[in-house]
Amino acid sequence: MVCFASLFEDVIMHHCPLCHNPESLHYFEDKRREYLQCAQCELVFVNPEQRLDAKAEKAHYDLHENDPNDAGYRTFLSRVADPILERIEPDSTGIDFGCGPGPTLSLMLQEQGHNMSLYDLYYHPNTEVLDRTYDFMTATEVIEHLYHPDQIWQQWLNLVKPGGWIGLMTKMVIDVEAFAKWHYKNDPTHVVFFSRNTFKYLAERDQLKLEFIGNDVILLRKAQ
């Protein structure tokens, strides 16, 4: 049964940026932003009028310091790397989408014998890699930043061969009480928030096998 912040809130006519459903409900509001929830896929998203522009968004990303030699960072990324490695064939091809200024997950997978390509809107904007298909794709701490998750989701599906894997890492919405205290929403570049039900909706719609690993890793497999 779908649970929203309040069954008595007025429906707001903001199209969901993921499934395009025209009906959303007020979910939460703080001093900086209003958050809405789609009545169909349950995506929680920031009011589009309150998102950063591209210049401010990149300035925030430039503050990130991800060192490929940082053992702690590698341990963090191993939460998605290890289950992907368990499921793919030797010498597979993959793409790390949204790899950031210090690609690390791709290096970890290359070290295990796989052939990796990189793409990032700001730091590795080589769009030629988006014209190929791969055995697997990874996107760690990426999906929550997407202004157009509908378009990028379809792009991800197109990047992966039949039977291929998509490995994602993102924190997921639990309920509005937890959301109110959630530090994850406070990052100004975090604009869409998925729940398990959102991923279940997408998996059913797009005929994907879905697995949750722990609290923040999502694996999806395309049909053969």
Model-derived regions, located:
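Feature marks short, surface-exposed loop/turn motifs that line or immediately flank catalytic pockets
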Residues: 125, 174-176
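A short His-aromatic
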Residues: 141, 145
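Residue-level detector of anion-binding/catalytic polar loops
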Residues: 115, 165, 209
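Alpha-helical subdomain
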Residues: 177-181, 185-196
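Conserved beta-strand signature within the Rossmann-like core of class I S-adenosyl-L-methionine
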Residues: 163-171
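Conserved N-terminal segment of class I S-adenosyl-L-methionine
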Residues: 1-136, 140, 153, 169, ...
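A short, conserved alpha-helix within the catalytic core of class I
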Residues: 146-156, 170
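Short conserved AdoMet
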Residues: 89, 147, 161
